[in-house]
Each structure stands twice: as structure tokens, then as C-alpha cells.
Curated annotation (Swiss-Prot):
Spans traversing the lipid bilayer: 33-53, 77-98, 113-133, 178-198, 226-246, 288-308, 320-340, 347-367
Keywords: Electron transport, Heme, Iron, Membrane, Metal-binding, Mitochondrion, Mitochondrion inner membrane, Respiratory chain, Transmembrane, Transmembrane helix, Transport, Ubiquinone
Source organism (scientific name): Mormoops blainvillei
Family the entry assigns: Belongs to the cytochrome b family.
UniProt gene name: MT-CYB
Database matches in PROSITE patterns: CYTB_CTER, CYTB_NTER
Pfam families: Cytochrom_B_C, Cytochrome_B
The name this protein goes by in its record: Cytochrome b
Length: 379
């Protein structure tokens, strides 16, 4: 008798995706992050669902409802901090996953890569709206500043901002709709994840060498399921340590002050995972220019497959490109640091230099160095 997992219409899909899936035998731990992101998404949906049962999306009660969750609900503080720090863990895994794709040339699978970019935008939008919900000072002013950026769009900008706000300022209508979208988007993300996997399984996984591995495949289960479980344990250990020992480490103290439209915080900044993009936004003195640079800092990922000039897919045998890649990583860390600093000398010039370098490395230096490596191969 044939195994039910190979004949049942539903189980057959699971089987071909997670059990009998042929996978390259050389996959390193850098390939763990896809499954870690799946765990993060599941955790966020689960904790978010229970938080939504106690949260009220009204400007008068939102802040108090979060306090109520932490103080009065059984293990409410665990749910709240798992959700907040789970978002940080989500972005750590997300950025490492994208970095892996850049380093090993996974962007040549353009359908999977493009769906990944859409996913990145969707997760960023969800995280931004989630940050507004506790209705602290940084929630309110973050929402005001970031939504206001849309007013830089010529002609329709001001109307667009007021349409998003549901009034003439960030208020009750804004909070209610942000809660609605924050609840809805993770389910849209889940659907996009399935499309992401569908496209991935059309081509099969890339591998560290960048050389086709059709002749050397192993079943996903048990080899990579066990490997993924190790990743789960390490990530959940790190997340548990963060939640139980230092839950506010990555948060902003200003968000423990209820939102007050009459009192602007001295330094408005988003969560740490948006600081690199925020630094790029601030480094351009022109409002529209800053907004375009902000969008392009993420959208530039879509251009990368088009400017891949190397004859090799992966960077593993390309030392010059490796140097540029790690320079880009250092540049992004610098931008993240600058995004959290006040707008004053010398941070302004450092931010502007790092922003120029970011686009310079990706758009000009990487294609040039790749072409040079092709030339060196002839020797």
C-alpha cells in the first residue's frame, strides 16, 4: 500500500514541500533562516491574536489596555514582550536571509526574489503599524512623522496624508485603521510566503557553491528538518533570554509615556530595525528626495538581478566581491547607528557619506568589480 502522505491531496503538498523535497547536500546554516522566519511569523500571529483579545484601539484607552495586559492578564507580560521582541528577532532573521541571498547569488531566481521583496515591504509596513498601537509618545510621533512623508508626493500628497489619517491629524481614526491593517497583514504575508515557497520549489534551492547540484540531492527530511530544529532551539533560546532578562533593551523609554500631541519628544526615531532607512531619509535635505531615497534603499534589491555582471552566481570564489559585500554590511551597521543619533555635527556628514556609499557599492562598485573578476578569470 502506498504511503498516505504520497496519495492524500493535502498531505501530498506538505510531503513534496517538507519531506520528500530534493535538497542540495551542501546547504550551510545560512539556509536555516527561511524556516526561522516561518517560526517567527507563526509566533507573531499567535501572540498577536491573544494580545488583540485584550487590546482596545481607542486613543483614550489604548495605552491603558497595554498596561492592563502587562499587569492584570495571566502571563500578559510574556505575550506582550514575546510579540515586541519577536518582531526584532523577525527582522534579524529577515536581514540575514536577504544578506545570504545577496552573498550566494540567490537573486538570480527572480520570481522568488521579487516575491521576497514584496514580503519585506509587507513585514515593514506591519511592524510600523504595530509600533503605533501602544499609543506612547514614540508611537504617536513616529506615526505623525512617517505618514507625513507622503505629503512630499506632488499634487496629491496632502490629500493622501489626510486620507490615511482619517482627519487632519493622527487621531482615533488613524489608530483604529492601523489596528485593523496590523491584524490583517500577517495573514496576507502568510499567503505571500506560500507563493514564495511555490516559486522556490519550481527552481529548487541554490547552494553555497553556486554550481547546479542536480546530481547531488538528499531528501529534506530527516537531514534538514533536524538541522532546522537546531536553529529553532538557538533562536528561541535567544528570544527567551531577551524577553525574560531584558525585555525593554530594544525598545524606546519614550513609549512608556502616553501619547501627547502637545509635547514633542527631543529625538523622534523608529524601532532599531528601521534606523538604516531612517538615516538615509534624513541624510538628504530635500523632503521628496529623502522619501525617494528611503523607498529606493529597499527597492534597490529589485535592481540587483539586473546588474549581476559576474560569470559566477555565488561570491564564495570571488574575494574582491566578498570585500565589497562586507563593506556594505559595515556601511549598513554605520547607518543603523547614525539613525539613532541626533541631527548634529558630526553625525550629519557621517550619515550622508554612509548613504552615498550604500548606493555606490550596490549600483556601481559591485557590477564593476564583478566584471573585473571575469577579466581576471581569463589569466
Amino acid at each position: 500500500m502506498t504511503n498516505i502522505r504520497k496519495t492524500h491531496p493535502l498531505l501530498k503538498i506538505v510531503n513534496t514541500s517538507f519531506v520528500d523535497l530534493p535538497a542540495p547536500s551542501s546547504l550551510s546554516s545560512w539556509w536555516n533562516f527561511g524556516s526561522l522566519l516561518g517560526i517567527c511569523l507563526g509566533l507573531q500571529i499567535l501572540t498577536g491574536l491573544f494580545l488583540a483579545m485584550h487590546y482596545t484601539s481607542d486613543t483614550a484607552t489604548a495605552f491603558n489596555s497595554v498596561t492592563h495586559i502587562c499587569r492584570d492578564v495571566n502571563y500578559g507580560w510574556v505575550l506582550r514582550y514575546l510579540h515586541a521582541n519577536g518582531a526584532s528577532m523577525f527582522f534579524i532573521c529577515l536581514y540575514l536571509h536577504v544578506g545570504r541571498g545577496l552573498y550566494y547569488g540567490s537573486y538570480t531566481y527572480s520570481e522568488t526574489w521579487n516575491i521576497g521583496i514584496i514580503l519585506l515591504f509587507a513585514v515593514m509596513a506591519t511592524a510600523f503599524m504595530g509600533y503605533v498601537l501602544p499609543w506612547g509618545q514614540m508611537s504617536f510621533w513616529g506615526a505623525t512623522v512617517i505618514t507625513n512623508l507622503l505629503s512630499a508626493i506632488p499634487y496629491i500628497g496632502t490629500d493622501l496624508v489626510q486620507w490615511i489619517w482619517g482627519g487632519f491629524s493622527v487621531d482615533k481614526a488613524t489608530l483604529t485603521r492601523f489596528f485593523a491593517f496590523h491584524f490583517l497583514l500577517p495573514f496576507i504575508i502568510s499567503a505571500l510566503v506560500m507563493v514564495h515557497l511555490l516559486f522556490l520549489h519550481e527552481t529548487g534551492s541554490n547552494n553555497p557553491t553556486g554550481i547546479p547540484s542536480d546530481s547531488d540531492m538528499i531528501p529534506f527530511h530527516p537531514y534538514y528538518t533536524i538541522k532546522d530544529i537546531l536553529g529553532f532551539l538557538l533562536m528561541l533560546t535567544a528570544l527567551s533570554a531577551l524577553v525574560l532578562f531584558s525585555p525593554d533593551l530594544l525598545g524606546d523609554p519614550d513609549n512608556y509615556t502616553p501619547a501627547n500631541p502637545l509635547n514633542t519628544p527631543p529625538h523622534i526615531k523608529p524601532e532599531w530595525y528601521f534606523l538604516f532607512a531612517y538615516a538615509i531619509l534624513r541624510s538628504i535635505p530635500n523632503k521628496l528626495g529623502g522619501v525617494l531615497a528611503l523607498v529606493m534603499s529597499i527597492l534597490i534589491l529589485a535592481v540587483i538581478p539586473l546588474i549581476h555582471t559576474s560569470k559566477q552566481q555565488s561570491m564564495i570564489f570571488r574575494p574582491l566581491s566578498q570585500c565589497l559585500f562586507w563593506l556594505l554590511v559595515a556601511d549598513l551597521l554605520t547607518l543603523t547607528w547614525i539613525g539613532g543619533q541626533p541631527v548634529e555635527h558630526p553625525y550629519i556628514i557621517i550619515g550622508q557619506t554612509a548613504s552615498i556609499l550604500y548606493f555606490l557599492i550596490i549600483l556601481i562598485l559591485m557590477p564593476l568589480v564583478s566584471a573585473m573578476e571575469n577579466y581576471l578569470l581569463k589569466w
